[in-house]
Amino acid sequence: MKIEIWSDVVCPWCYIGKRRIEKALAGFEHADEVEVHWRSYQLDPGAPTTPTEKTSSMLARKYGQSPAGAQQMQDRVEAVAAEEGLVYRLSETLHLNTVDAHRLIHLGHEQGGNELQGQVKEALLQAYFTEARDVADHDVLREVAVAAGLEPRRVDEVLAGTEFTEDVHADIAQAQAYGASGVPFFVVDEKYGISGAQPAEVFSQVLEKAWSESHPRIEVLATADGGEACGPDGCAI
């Protein structure tokens, strides 16, 4: 079974959604046969690569809110994150461009498949939300990526050029083709789409449904009671 997850490094609900799908997988009987692949999505492709303002200020300006109103919204998200064991510092996060972070997530998949890609994704989310670091800054990105397991030389090569940019854009185009208007967005076996950071129970239901459909059980229409057969204890005579 394959789960594709579209998310952005600066999306607070994406980190929450990550924890919830992980919780669902922890209770899923066939979790060891599930592949999780991270896809790129940018909430604001035009955001600056050199940030100049806090996310809270940008949101207040964008939605016409007062600073107090923006703070209340952030407090609510932080409370939900805490329920999932996450520590957010939203009042300190910066409004920034995530294309380079996404390019390193693609590098993670190239170097170590879904497992290493997931480690890079987790490290970047933690750096942004828990540590309030500037994940558009190349020095920060290099430090986080190398600590997560990426090869330093390749990290430098990617950050110095445009490698994987087309992959990032292709992921975004695919999400739009699926009808996704926001993130997180989950697609299970290219068949079921789940929008938003749904409760773990919702993910569990979809996982069970998708698994049962891809691994159907044979319906037995006639049993041994109506016809002779052999079993562990011998054959009917």
Where are these regions (language model features)?
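Short, well-ordered beta-strand elements
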Residues: 1-6, 37-39
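Structural alpha/beta surface segment adjacent to cysteine/selenocysteine redox centers
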Residues: 19-127, 230, 235
